[in-house]
């Protein structure tokens, strides 16, 4: 019986300085990846977020995917990165009435997932007013995320809710509570150690947030931070565009070796659960930000992505988690000579 393994992927735009499709795909193919998550890309008419792609651009990307041997792991859409309430709070976050958002943006993300033949959409848990307690807005966030999960479910898709600063679901505990209340098979959670560390959590606290998220886990973003941030208030507002200490998974305080060793024991059951929804397995999606990151993305460059991937593979080897990078047999299969 084959050993359960993880599927390696990356936010492709992080591997490219100019975000062109060829640059992104060349870097990932050279690193041996077979999957990528699609966020921002230039197909010849300037850099666009995935949500803005035209059908002609989608078709061009699909042809390039075939050429470079890549498949989409997830649509890395900014779904849920808008305000819950139409209230001025000193941020630049947009507000969109939810009925309109569900009918337009969420529907568009579902269409994109089908166009790129993936079952996964990455998203977020909405911004409460800047200085409010996120707990005070759980009810509305749960209601809206439940409707998003149902929209994805009706399209045979799964919505992954990422933990991130400043959102309602800014901690593992809060995301776990959202997941419990929504209670929908199309909603899973996306763990990200750096997104917790940068809010002032200690390594021991990051482990507790991981444990809270495990029952709802769908996949993991691989990003680490050099040291806990002194924020004054754990879980308080974070100026995301000023964060500067992102590091590979073998250099940070996120405890990835312990977390991934724990994930190893979850892989058989979690893989089966995801496969029942048409998802090929458990993704580890590299989003290293090693050249910098902010609210709507980050950059690593082709060399930085390579450094981050090698760091992750070293951690996986120590944690005894199986994975696969393209090898000569894959090349022969692509040539049609096997």
Stretches found by the model and what they are:
Residues 2-9, 17-34, 66, 172-338:
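Histidine-acidic metal/acid-base catalytic patches
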Residues 37-38, 72-77, 118-125, 158-162, ...:
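Short beta-strand segments at enzyme active-site cores
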């Amino acid at each position: 019986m084959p050993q359960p393994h993880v599927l390696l992927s990356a936010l492709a735009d992080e591997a490219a300085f100019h975000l062109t499709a060829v640059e992104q795909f060349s870097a990932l193919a050279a690193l041996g990846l077979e999957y990528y998550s699609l966020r921002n890309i230039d197909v010849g008419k300037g850099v666009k977020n995935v949500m803005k792609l035209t059908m002609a651009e989608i078709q061009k990307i699909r042809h390039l995917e075939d050429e470079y041997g890549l498949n989409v792991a997830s649509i890395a859409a900014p779904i849920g990165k808008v305000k819950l309430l139409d209230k001025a709070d000193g941020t630049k976050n947009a507000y969109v009435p939810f009925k309109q958002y569900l009918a337009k943006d969420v529907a568009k993300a579902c269409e994109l997932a089908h166009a790129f033949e993936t079952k996964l959409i990455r998203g977020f848990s909405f911004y409460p007013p800047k200085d409010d307690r996120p707990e005070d807005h759980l009810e509305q966030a749960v209601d809206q995320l439940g409707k998003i999960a149902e929209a994805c479910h009706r399209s045979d898709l799964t919505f992954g809710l990422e933990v991130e600063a400043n959102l309602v679901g800014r901690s593992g505990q809060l995301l776990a509570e959202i997941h419990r209340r929504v209670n929908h098979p199309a909603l899973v959670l996306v763990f990200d150690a750096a997104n917790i560390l940068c809010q002032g959590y200690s390594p021991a606290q990051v482990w507790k947030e991981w444990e809270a998220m495990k029952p709802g886990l769908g996949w993991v973003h691989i990003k680490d931070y050099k040291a806990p941030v002194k924020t004054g208030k754990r879980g308080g507002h974070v100026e995301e565009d000023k964060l500067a200490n992102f590091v590979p998974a073998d250099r940070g305080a996120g405890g990835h070796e312990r977390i991934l060793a724990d994930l190893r024991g979850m892989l058989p059951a979690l893989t089966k659960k995801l496969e029942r929804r048409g998802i090929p397995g458990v993704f580890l999606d590299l989003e290293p930000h090693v050249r910098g990151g902010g609210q709507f993305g980050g950059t690593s460059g082709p060399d930085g992505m390579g450094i981050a991937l090698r760091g992750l593979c070293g951690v996986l080897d120590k944690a005894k988690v199986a994975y696969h990078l393209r090898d000569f047999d894959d090349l022969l299969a692509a040539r049609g000579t096997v």
